[in-house]
């Protein structure tokens, strides 16, 4: 592939949320639907023994929370996806703020019962300052939740951004029936089991007037869905990708990450609309991803990721050109030439040596020099 083709197919984004909104669970299910893992783990579960892929540090497994950003990458339908799962707790917010400088878009997870919470507002302020494109995923619809339109109004008011639902829930809590995808015109039917594999049932319903809708969810919920969709189409403007890319409009999805519902719709739409690697602003000029000279920046240094070794790992975001292993690069601040003999790609704690990396990629390298 050419450099431009490599750039175009990359998507690098962070998942952010207030603590316990389901951020790490959603990340795990995106990995599952993307084919990066075959069985989803859980943050805390008596049924599921496998831990969350992104919570690989011992303290994270003990506490059931994320304390440091984890980076995971996978291929999906021709796109190269890089997910950064960030800490939600305020004590570790600095890690999240640094991570937001290295991503091209963001998915915000909101608990459907609690709505917009304090840490979500703070993180959204950072996104707004950087004009970062935002997608909202309203989670935990399998539990009693606020009404969908109330949640949409709350997101607009509290996060100060226009919204456009691209999926819509059919009830919530004990009567939750599933999610209707307004983007693809299909229905995902809900079952109450915690699914570990990506096998959600999807029914194509291109015309909501079809009697197939009653056959799938019953007369009462079919009538309610038709009314809700009519209201959505009447109240909200059509989805404008340009406004989304400028950080002015947030597409909204509903679902239950732990039960897989709404996750596939989110992933499919994300791959279509999310931005490729964006130009990087510097003190003197804008660096375009397609420039031939390799540039990048270290946005985080993490010590002691491996408990068996005293290590310092630099998280490096590639901004332009092609990164090559064993090639000398100028460290601008020190004026020194640096060579990376064992740069690695991320999959949480797992690592694999890479020979090349392209704009949008997050790589890691051992820090023997001050960077």
Q: What label would you give each PLM region?
A:
Residues 1-370:
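Structural and coupling elements of P-loop NTPases
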């Amino acid at each position: 592939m050419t450099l431009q083709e490599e750039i175009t197919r990359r998507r690098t984004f962070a998942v952010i949320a207030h603590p316990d909104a389901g951020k790490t669970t959603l990340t795990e299910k995106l990995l599952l639907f993307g084919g990066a893992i075959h069985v989803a783990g859980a943050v805390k579960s008596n049924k599921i023994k496998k831990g969350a892929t992104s919570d690989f540090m011992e303290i994270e497994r003990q506490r059931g929370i994320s304390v440091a950003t984890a980076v995971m990458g996978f291929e999906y339908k021709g796109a190269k996806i890089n997910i950064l799962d960030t800490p939600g707790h305020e004590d570790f917010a600095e890690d999240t703020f640094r991570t937001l400088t290295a991503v091209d878009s963001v998915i915000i997870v909101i608990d459907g019962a609690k709505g917009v919470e304090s840490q979500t507002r703070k993180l959204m302020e950072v996104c707004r300052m950087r004009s970062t494109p935002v997608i909202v995923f309203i989670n935990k619809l399998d539990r009693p939740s606020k009404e969908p339109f109330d949640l949409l109004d709350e997101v607009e008011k509290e996060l100060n951004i226009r919204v456009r639902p691209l999926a819509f829930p059919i009830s919530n809590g004990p009567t939750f029936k599933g999610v209707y995808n307004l983007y693809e015109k299909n229905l995902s039917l809900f079952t109450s089991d915690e699914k570990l594999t990506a096998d959600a049932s999807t029914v194509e319903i291109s015309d909501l007037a079809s009697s197939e809708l009653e056959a799938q969810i019953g007369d009462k919920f079919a009538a309610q869905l038709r009314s809700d969709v009519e209201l959505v189409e009447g109240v909200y403007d059509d989805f404008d990708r340009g406004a989304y890319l400028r950080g002015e409009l947030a597409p909204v999805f509903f679902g239950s990450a732990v039960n897989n519902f709404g996750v596939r719709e989110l992933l499919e739409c994300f791959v279509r609309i999310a931005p490729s690697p964006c130009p990087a602003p510097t003190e003197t000029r804008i660096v375009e991803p397609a420039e031939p000279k390799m540039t990048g920046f270290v946005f985080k240094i993490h010590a002691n990721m491996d408990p068996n070794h005293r290590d310092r790992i630099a998280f490096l975001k590639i901004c332009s050109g092609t990164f090559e292993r064993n090639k000398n690069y100028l460290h601008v601040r020190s004026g020194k030439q640096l060579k990376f003999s064992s740069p690695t790609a991320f999959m949480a704690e797992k690592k694999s040596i890479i020979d090349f990396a392209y704009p949008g990629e997050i790589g890691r390298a051992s820090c023997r020099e001050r960077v």
